[in-house]
Amino acid sequence: MVDATVGHGGHSLLFGRSLGPEGILVGLDIDPPSLERARERLASLTCRVILVKSNFACLAERLGELGIEKVDFILADLGFNSAQLADAEMGLSFRTEDMPLDMRIDKSLTTTAADIVNGYDEKSLADLIFEYGQDRASRRIARYIVRRRQQERITTTGQLVEIVCSALRTPGGKHRPRKHPATRTFQALRIAVNRELENLDRLLATAPKLLRTGGYLAVISFHSLEDGRVKWDFKRNQQEGVYRLLTRKPIVADPKEIAENRRARSAKLRIAQRN
């Protein structure tokens, strides 16, 4: 099996226990600290464990390098772990201490969130926040960003939170019901910096070529842009006779799981089987 986003190894540990000594588990992650945590966590498994530093967009290339042509199961959990959200160097969160406005999971990428915020023109910023953040106030937010950067370079998450809150006339220390005002802007920047949708599209396009007949593709998404892509891809492949859908509607977390893990409230699981 392939865990395309191995993270700290939680999913891999669960599935790896059922593989046995003859099984092979390949785990990919672009974040080195996550790979080290996974290596420690999966050490007790009896199956062969291969961990690779790579984005799942390059899954076909990585499997080719390992001499693996077909697999029985591909799992992709598109969420972030708590350690990444708390990592000051990544600057992914607006809820923790003031962080550098970076947002790169893969440090080999050259463009940071600060580069976008300080470099894009107002229209491009507004379009990005609207398309990737789905924020109807995108033009107003972009206007406030441009106004602030004319005074000083925007380099920290705290600065950006303050700007967005000002644009939405929300005091920096208060949240609107259920969702922080900066949520959508941060989502848009994170998606753009890490090329998340482009990478997901590449994985979805590659999966049918890698799965054996009867093999499974399972994707856990966390916002509508991801889920919409997965839903469309699964439906198209079903119509073309490539997949059989095992989830007509996405599987979502029950109240007990949400109580234990608040981020699970946004998770949607879709599963397809290769014909």
Predicted regions and their residues:
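S-adenosyl-L-methionine-dependent methyltransferase catalytic core, i.e., the SAM/SAH-binding region
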Residues: 1-275
